[in-house]
Amino acid sequence: VITNAKIGNLAVDTIKIANRAVTSQTSTVVSSFRNTYVNGVGWVTQTVATLTFTGVAGDQVIIGFSVKQLYPGGSDRDAYAYLVLNNSVIGTIAARDGSYVSGSIVRAAGTLTGSNTVKVLAGGDNTYADLTDTSLFVFEAFK
């Protein structure tokens, strides 16, 4: 059983495999932001997408995310987007040394709890992120 939902710019695919159900609820995703380096602090990340869902504790899950474009703010600057499952980073998209990345997709595996939160965090030195096509997917959960 595959159900599709789209809220704002956040597309969610929920797949039920071998009776391991994952039910999803979503929040909105921001379409873009500019992140500026803070003196004495460094660069900070911003949550750009959030997905919450219930699962069976101990199950493994495959999660994917994509970011349309990440632009570092200069030739010596870096930008990152992190995939975070229940406060642990499980995947990264990186744009380094001033080179932008476009259409990057990362899939990563993690372990579920009963109630799960997946986030995409992005940030960097004067980073601009175009997130209009950002997607966050729960591909499957399995025992």
Regions found by a protein language model. Give the residues of each.
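Fibrous stalk/shaft segments of extracellular and virion attachment machinery
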Residues: 1-30, 34
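Extracellular jelly-roll beta-sandwich "head" domains, especially the C-terminal globular C1q domain
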Residues: 22-143
